[in-house]
Amino acid sequence: SEVGGPDAPVVLVGREAGSGTRDGFESIVGVEDACVYEQELTSTGAVMAAVAANPNAFGYVSLSAVDDTVKMVTVDGVEASEATVQDGSYKIQRPFIFVTKDGEELSAQAQAFVDFATSDAASDLIAGAGAVPLA
């Protein structure tokens, strides 16, 4: 009841240690290796199912995985959406970057991949998969 809900313990549901999703979430919110999860699960689907089954559960998943079995949480009054992720106003998000060996020029094939990955065609594929494309 201290956080506005029923008088019941909050059940924190997360991914297993070593999960990229868990590492990303914990680093974004600044709690690396400090969370104590009631349930540590091995898939996004399992996290969503556990949260959907318990009104006192709280978990984290990728925006692209959210369906109508769970409710997204607003952060600082901002709802999660493609637009709020792209403009940076939804604070719980993680960017991905391309990397290559330091001091080396990209090969023609690697440059072709980067060109495609940053193209409108790739953005359409990314959006079609339910993820947030480049802004």
Specify the residue positions occupied by each region the protein language model found.
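Exported/periplasmic ABC-transporter solute-binding proteins
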Residues: 1-135
